Amino acid sequence: MSNFDFLKDEFIDLYELCLEAEKNCYIKPRTSAFYSRLALEFCVGLVYKFEKIQTSYNEMSLNDLINKKEFKDLFQDESQIAGLNLIRKFGNDAAHMLKNIISNADRNLSLNKDIALNCLKGIFDFTVWIAYCYGST
């Protein structure tokens, strides 16, 4: 049983990404943060699709998509966007270790279960919103 079972029927691909993030949260926090970011990308793509938000090829980074005015206007509170950006940043850290090693930054090496859990909570909240807004049930 998963906290994301509510996604199974209508958003199976999203469910599978979230399930990986959930399964790995305590045993492989880096993997969990990475899958939370992938789920975030999927969710943002769904919002753009369902809301028919236009974007150009030059605006295709996740950062650009999250911070685009038409996307941000869908949310009541700026803290919701800040939460999505944290998932994006920690997911980036999980995936891109080389830059941080070369620059001697320690933040990439400190991805722990607390960070993974915060990412997971954030993606859970976003997927509940996705299911509520765009699901049929």
List each language-model region with its residue ranges.
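Charge-enriched, short contiguous segments at helix-coil
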Residues: A33, E78-S136
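Short, charged amphipathic alpha-helical segments flanked by flexible coils
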Residues: Y48-K89
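Amphipathic, well-ordered alpha-helical segments in soluble domains
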Residues: D13, L17, Y35-L38, F42, ...
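A ubiquitous short alpha-helical element
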Residues: M1-L7, K72-Q80, N108
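Hydrophobic alpha-helical packing segments in soluble, helical-rich domains
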Residues: P29-Q54
